[in-house]
Amino acid sequence: MRRVLKYGGTSIESADRIRRAAQNIAQLLKSGDQLAVVVSAQGNDTNLRLNSVYTATERHADLQSMYRVVALGEEKSTFLLTAALRSLSVDAVPFVPSVAETWPLIVDSPDGALLQAQKINEERPLEVQEDESRRLFGARVLPVLRRGGVAVISGFFARSMRGDLTTLGRGGSDISGVLVGRFLDAEEVTIITDVEGILSADPRLAENPRLIEEMTVEDLETMASRGARVVHPRALRYKPESCRVRVVDFRRQEALAQSGTSVLGVSEPSLSARSEPQSMLTLVGKDLAGRTGVLGELASQLGRAGIAITASTTNDTFVCLYLAERDGEAAYRLLHSLMTGSQREMGLVNVTLRPGVAEVRLRSPEFLQTPGILAEITSVLA
């Protein structure tokens, strides 16, 4: 199997952990795997280097100088792991962004301009130079794997077509790992981090959450859009269909095939429409956000009548329910009798019915990072 291992900063934050990673890599190599390894800076190294640059320059460092200093964190990890692997008689070859002659990953900003220093770690649009990167990976990295060696590659950084250093922004090391897998046609990218995989709940908030062994890219992007962070969703945009992403706890890295969560599928936009016309029921009231159980009671009453809600919207002054058009009038009469009868304390004062509503569903991972996208979509519909 051709595999990419991506080690997060916690996973290699000490010399002992680097040694353990090297031993695991050497063992995988003996089993016949072709391996490339992507490494983050150790622990809090990036922030320490940023603070040093800010202090030394009174926050007036030019961007390339800052990148060179910060990149030393990833390069240190790269050379430490390379040394550890060589001590185990592994043919390890380092690839660091400061050495342009061997570096394979080429990424530009859309306008070709350098970004502001204070935004070194922000989310940014990227233009991955697919053809050039694939050519360089084929010429520089693949030969190492084919002869039985290990390519050790710095994460988070890239070079532009004009040769400048740049970063991949938030989630950059995850992006690096997936891109390396993409350009090496790897069967799996294994992200080795400080959690055991993707869980059914946050273990800090819920007892005994269970490990989810498999999930789709779409599901993971949905989780990430609502605050969950295991694999950065930006990284998943570059995942090929043929490549599996696996999230594994560094404490269980010796059992890669038996642990963690596998992420399957690809990240792609979708457009669909509900085939059946909908009705929109709008219930108006006061201080609805401060009242407990309003939406639950409405849904319960409709459910007992065999009427399904397909979507809902609420705020402090109204509850808007969407349901099949054929159920609209029955639901209207039911909810009107509810708000004027036994449930007047819910604070609802008026209900309106609008039939003939169409439902169009658009989904894209780009929506989260695209300001004004809702206005653009609704302007087309208007």
Predicted regions mapped to residue ranges:
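Conserved glycine-bearing catalytic or ligand-binding loops at nucleotide- and phosphate-handling centers
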Residues: 228-234, 238, 243-258
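Glycine-rich beta-alpha junction loops
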Residues: 42-43, 195-197, 243, 249-254, ...
